[in-house]
Amino acid sequence: MKWISAEHYKALLALVLLLLFACQDADFPRPLHSDLLTESADNNLPPEPSSHIVDLESLDQAQLVKKATSNNFMVVTANPHATAAAKKILLQGGTAMDAAIAAQLVLGLVEPQSSGIGGGGFLLYWDAKQKTLKSYDGRETAPLSVDENLFFSPELGKTDKFFAAVLGGKSVGVPGLMKMLELAHQQHGELDWQQLFSPAIQLADQGFAVSERLNTLLRLVPKVKQREAIRQYFFDQQGEPWAIGAQLKNPEYAQTLVKLAEQGGDYLYRSELTQKIIIAVNQDDNAGYLTAKDFTEYQPLERTPVCRHVFNYRLCGMGPPSSGATTVLATLLILEQLAEPILAAGDEPIENNPLLAHYFIEALRLAFADRNTYVADPKFVPVPINQLLATDYLHSRAQLINAQRAMPVVVAGDLESPLSARFTTQGSPELESTTHLSIVDQLGNAVSMTTSIETAFGSRLMVGGFLLNNQLTDFSFSPTKNRFPVPNRVEP
């Protein structure tokens, strides 16, 4: 067999990333433009974020995969303001963890539709000195008083309609982001906690230019105006979204951040802000079930990362309850088996090979079928990660892929798992939302963090200058299917 170079592997991984982005769900309104995301110590941000807005459809493939390098550090976020905040913290001697917190607090201001302190997140941290990888689970939890019938009426035998469930307090889970960031900072931060809040507080007080992305989403996302606080903040007196470039201030968010900087995460979980959130949720027309006990008992968790060797790299990601790493690794491990002859031949540029694209799509379909059947919250159901990523099992899955045609039907594999015997599968609506950031600092420490308030603009409830999540609608609305329990049903 012909020797396969590292460059071939790198090129294939780059192709996979491009395909992952190209295969994003298209059911939700897509913003017309996106911000260029990368900042390094060797490059300065332009004075205005608008100069970083690029129409991705106008770029050719070479521009889309253009490399960005740095000798010092690298920051990738969804908004130039957040990138600038992270850069500032790094230049002050902060770690990647410090920078990630500063960036996230700014993202909650300038891209509030996607993430914020009213939501949750997952975080991976690589400690370069200790050579250790840690993962943190700060996702929202269901209130203690809800049950599996939160979005289901046993009497009528019907589930709530999706947006009827999303809007208002019923969909709000206990926010977890602040507690997770606080825990991670205690273990990996270098700068004082209060120092990390300065960029976001200053920007909230002084104002920021409304981006085309925010303006577009306010126009396109369904039912954004359903709650008064959102109408007052995001829309002008004529009921139109603030124009692109308009200066938007959020003094209420600034004050919330000041208190969080002074009092720590407890300000969100044990204070008057907690009571404001509970009142907003429980007194809404579509009332929820949050209590003070839900907040005081919330704890972020340290999880075990999921790691495998694939394409000459050791790739790691967040384990359950996140399904991301398990699904991506299964996809890549299947693809690795199918791609090896193509890589060894080296006949044409990998990015131009349609067979590789076909193999990737089919591998992804198989991985998602397993994900939807076997991956859930390990607190409630056993997740057979080792079986799902076993070499023999994935070899058998790869054999199902035909080089000439797509599989007509894709089903989950047959694992000897108690989950398959006790539970059935039922998907949840997949809508675009959420944000991700990646940071590597001067010492080689690295953060990979995904945060969310679930769908765009969350529950449409706004308290303290930030939006509350609608995470509970990420659970399956129906607790059973064909008389078998659904593993992703609502449970406290």
Give, region by region, the residue ranges found by the protein language model.
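Active-site rim segments in enzyme catalytic domains, especially the processed small/beta chain
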Residues: 109-116, 120-126, 130-135, 288-291, ...
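Glycine-rich phosphate/pyrophosphate-binding beta-alpha loops
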Residues: 316-325, 434-438, 448-460
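Internal maturation/activation junctions in enzymes
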Residues: 52-53, 340-452
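Bacterial N-terminal signal peptides that target proteins for export
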Residues: 1-12
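Active-site Gly/Thr loop motif
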Residues: 287-311, 398-428, 469-492
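Noncatalytic scaffold domains of N-terminal-nucleophile
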Residues: 29-84, 88, 96-264, 268-270, ...
